[in-house]
Amino acid sequence: MEGNGVSSTASVERMTRQRVDWAAGRWTREPAGTRLDGGTLVVAASEGSDYWRTTHYGFVHDDGHGLLGEWPADAAVEVTFESSSLTALYDQAGVLLYAGPEQWVKAGLELSDGVLHLGAVVTNGVSDWSMAPVPDWAGQRITIRASRGGVAGDAVTIRARTETSGWRSVRVAPFTAGAASAGPLVCAPMRGDLEVRFTEWALAPADRDLHEDPPLD
């Protein structure tokens, strides 16, 4: 994949918000197709792609499409995408935080029971899914943010916003303080023609405080 001409990472000590080049990431599973369009990345998902481990359903899916890059300790990752194409059951787009096949988090939007939901699946051996309906977010440009931190550095704070709203808290969850990667995610468990347009992937300074919203840009 060709790059979009922007830099990837910098040391946390001097980090400012910076875009990540699409070419800096590696796919957990190659999608059905990708193309660059004016600096945005359009991803076509493969039918049946998903991430889930065991809980309730009994099955394990480890074949979603995550574009992963370095995620430094004490840093945040932000992924922005257009939600207009999420129209079929279980269509998903957002961010994947990955420390291994049994320790990962996916956070973003998913269409469930005909309604768009904002949520997160936190997996430590088995998956734990939390979600809330956001029907008014349909068709908007969405940013999902995940910030590493906590007293021991072993937690992640997930927030989300639309292009016209402030940050909304989604989840605070345990997450390894060790090596991990993160980046855009798309899954299409039920169809083979989902395309999602990602407009930005960025690294930013970590949240200063759990109860203080990060900057909007």
Give each language-model segment a name.
Residues 2-217:
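Extracellular glycan-recognition regions
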